[in-house]
């Protein structure tokens, strides 16, 4: 889940604008796509708002879009045209940092890895399973068939929650 230099630069530029809208910045994706890039910003309710069962609204997304557009116009960090999307992370939320997974212990996550883990027939680069353990260096996932994978955090390319209706 190492962020690219461009994503880190964009995050540093837009974080204050997002905070000014009274929401938390969950993560940033930047996808250069030839003539038109995509900048996707995920916002989350502040912890105190989540405690009061408040969610991100369309009005929050519109406010962040307005604020961030102004900041990006001034700093101009993206060459060429781009599309700006602002939304909540949703039910199948992507994780951008290990600490974001803490609240989802015991839930099912999907991981795309840089290097395959396991051995023999259980060797894989994609792992889906219950998040059993997380520390500052690795996490442990148990798959539906009972296989346990201990995965170094720096081996994770992408991670997201798998929504399951309880």
UniProtKB/Swiss-Prot annotation:
Transmembrane segments: none annotated. It comes from the Bacteria. InterPro entries: Ribosome_maturation_RimP (IPR003728), RimP_C (IPR028998), RimP_C_sf (IPR036847), RimP_N (IPR028989), RimP_N_sf (IPR035956). Its main location: cytoplasm. One of its GO terms (biological process) is translation. CDD domains: YlxS_C. It is found in: Cytoplasm. Keywords: Cytoplasm, Ribosome biogenesis. One of its GO terms (cellular component) is cytosol. NCBIfam families: PRK14631.1. Required for maturation of 30S ribosomal subunits. Belongs to the RimP family. This is Ribosome maturation factor RimP.
